Amino acid sequence: MNANDNVVIVGTGLAGVEVAFGLRASGWEGNIRLVGDATVIPHHLPPLSKAYLAGKATAESLYLRTPDAYAAQNIQLLGGTQVTAINRDRQQVILSDGRALDYDRLVLATGGRPRPLPVASGAVGKANNFRYLRTLEDAECIRRQLIADNRLVVIGGGYIGLEVAATAIKANMHVTLLDTAARVLERVTAPPVSAFYEHLHREAGVDIRTGTQVCGFEMSTDQQKVTAVLCEDGTRLPADLVIAGIGLIPNCELASAAGLQVDNGIVINEHMQTSDPLIMAVGDCARFHSQLYDRWVRIESVPNALEQARKIAAILCGKVPRDEAAPWFWSDQYEIGLKMVGLSEGYDRIIVRGSLAQPDFSVFYLQGDRVLAVDTVNRPVEFNQSKQIITDRLPVEPNLLGDESVPLKEIIAAAKAELSSA
C-alpha cells in the first residue's frame, strides 16, 4: 500500500513524530521524511516546566522515541534542517541547504513559538537571564539559574508561569509573578479557580501581582544581564532571573508564503486538509471547525496533537478516523493536579462539586443546561467521567452536579437512559 508515495512532515515535535509513527503503524509503505530545525532528538515539551526544570528528569527520559526507533521504522529524520519554502506546483519542499524533497502528501506540524514581550527587545532579549520556555535549551539555561535565595520574576500568569513559579519556590528562590490580567488563568478558568490557585501560590511564598504591566528593564553596565524589572505603576523589582510566558504564536509563515489559507493558524477541513488538498496540518498550528462546539478553534494541547496525528494517519491509510473527542489539558503545580476537559468559552454559570477550600473539587461550566467544560482538582475519576459527559453531549441534570451525595456515575447513567429513550 502506498509503496511509491512520499510523505514529508515538517516539524519534529509531538504532532509530527506521531504522524510519522502512526502512518507506519497503520500500514503506510512509502517513504516518510520528518524534517525540523531542532538539532536535538524530538522530545516531550510539558515536562520542561515541571520535572525537567526541577532536576527530576533527564533529557533522554523526554525522548518521544528512542534515537534508533526512527531507522527501525524506516523514518528518515532530518534534524537541524529548515524548510524554507513549499513549491506546490512541483510538489516539493525546499530545504535550507538547497535540497528539494518531493512529496505526494505534505503534513505541516510547525507548532508555535513563544509570544514575545514587546518591551523585551534588543539587549534584553539577548540576556542570558531573560528567557522564554519552549525548548530543551531554554529549560537547561533556566535550570542552571534556579539558585536558592536568588530573585526570580515571572511575567505571565498562565500555566507555564505558574508551573515555573512552583518549581522555583521548591528551589528556595524568591519569586514574584506579574500578570496584566485581573487574575491568574483568567483566559481559561472561572474566578473561583483563579482564586484557589492564587491562594495556593501565595501560601507557598509567591508574590503574585495581577493587573501589573511591565514597561521596561534595567540592565547591567555591560548590557549582558537584566538586573531589574520595571512596572508601569513605578515598581522596580530587582531580578537575578526573568522568565516570560505570555502565550504562543502559531508558526504559519511557511503556509502563508505558499498561498495556503491562514487565520490564527493554518486552516484545515474535517479531513485535516489545508486549502491545498495535498497538504495537511496538525497540532498547535492547525485551526479547525469543532463539531462539538460548532466554532473554529486552535487547540494547544498534547491530547489534541495526538488525536489529530492519529486522524491523519488513518485518513492517509484509507481507514476511518475516530470521531472528535473533547479536548483536555493538565497542569501540575506543587502536589496539586489540575485536569481540564472541554472549552469553557461562552459559559453562563458554574457549578462547584466539592469545596474550593480544599484541593479536592470539580467546577462545571454550563451554557444553559449543557456542560461545556469541567475543571477537576485532584479528582481523576471525575475528570474521566467528565470527558464522557462532554464528548457524548450527555444531558445531565445540572441541579445534581453540585450534590456529592449523588455519584457522578449515577448522573451519567440517568442521562444515557434519557438519551436512549428519546
From Swiss-Prot:
Induction: Induced by camphor and repressed by CamR. Its cofactor is FAD. The oxidation of camphor by cytochrome P450-CAM CamC requires the participation of the flavoprotein, putidaredoxin reductase CamA, and the iron-sulfur protein, putidaredoxin CamB, to mediate the transfer of electrons from NADH to P450 for oxygen activation. It holds the Pfam family Reductase_C. FAD binds at residues 15, 37, 50, 83, 134, 284, 302. GO terms for cellular component: cytoplasm. Its EC number is 1.18.1.5. NAD(+) binds at residues 156-165. It catalyses: 2 reduced [2Fe-2S]-[putidaredoxin] + NAD(+) + H(+) = 2 oxidized [2Fe-2S]-[putidaredoxin] + NADH. It comes from Pseudomonas putida (Arthrobacter siderocapsulatus). This is Putidaredoxin reductase CamA. Keywords: FAD, Flavoprotein, NAD, Oxidoreductase. Pathway: Terpene metabolism; (R)-camphor degradation. The keyword Transcription does not apply. Belongs to the FAD-dependent oxidoreductase family. Homodimer or monomer.
